[in-house]
Amino acid sequence: TNVSLRGGGERIKYYSSLGYMKQNGVSDKYSYEQVNMILNTDAMLLSDKSLKFTFNLNGNTSNNNKPADGEGVFNNAMYGDWMPKRPAAWSTGLPRKGSVEAQLNNGFNNTESYRFQMNAALKWSVPWVEGLSAQASLNFTTSYYHQRHFNHDQEGVYDNPYATAVSSYNPENANLYEKWNKYKLLTGIFQIDYTRSFGKHNLSAMVNYQSQVRKSNWTDAKKKGYPTTLAPQLDL
C-alpha cells in the first residue's frame, strides 16, 4: 500500500510518500513488515532562479520475524534426503520430533530495524560568470537494529510412535541472544563547478571537498537456562 502527494508551483516543488508492506512466508512463523516515508522538496530562493535549495528526507522501519533456524528449516526440507522420510506425525498420529513442523517451533529469530536519511543542499549558479556554480550539501544517515534470537528444544513432539509423554525439555538447551547496533554517518560536501564552451572547445573544471564523521557501536548479550519458553528475557 502506498499513498503519495506531489505538488508545488514555479519556484517550489514537493513530493511526499507513505508506504506500508507486509509479507507472510510459507509458514506463519515467517513474516516481514515495513513502513516507508519519503519527503522531497526543491525551492528556488531567488527570482532569477540562481539559488536552489534541496531538502530530502526518507526513512523506514521494519520487523523481520522467523523461527530460530531461519531459512535453514526449508533448506533442509528441500535439499536434505532425510527430511522427506520424516512426516509431521508418527503413524499413530502423534506429532513427530525432527519434522519440518517441529523445527518451526523451537524458538524465534526476530529483528527490528530503523533507518533514517536526510540531505540538505544549496546550489548557487553565479549570474555574472557563465558556467560557474557552487554547491554545499549536508547528508546525515542513521540506523538502528535490535535482534532477538531464542533457541530451545522442540516442544509438543514425541520421540517414537508409542511414547506416552512428550519429548523432554532441557532448560539448559534454551538460550537467548540479543544484539543492539547503532550507526551514524554525517557527510559535508562543498563543490565548485565551471563548464564553458568556446567554439568547438569545451572546458570543464571541478573543485570538491568532502568531510565525514562516522560513529558506530554495538552491544550483545547471551543467556542460557530457561525453565519456560513463554517470555524469555535478559537480565541486564
Question: For the regions a protein language model found, what residue spans apply to each?
Answer:
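Surface-exposed loop/interface segments of Gram-negative outer-membrane beta-barrel transport/assembly proteins
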Residues: 1, 25-36, 40-117, 133-236
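A short beta-strand motif that forms part of the nucleic acid-binding face
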Residues: 19-20, 59
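Short glycine-rich, acidic/polar surface loops and turns
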Residues: 2-6
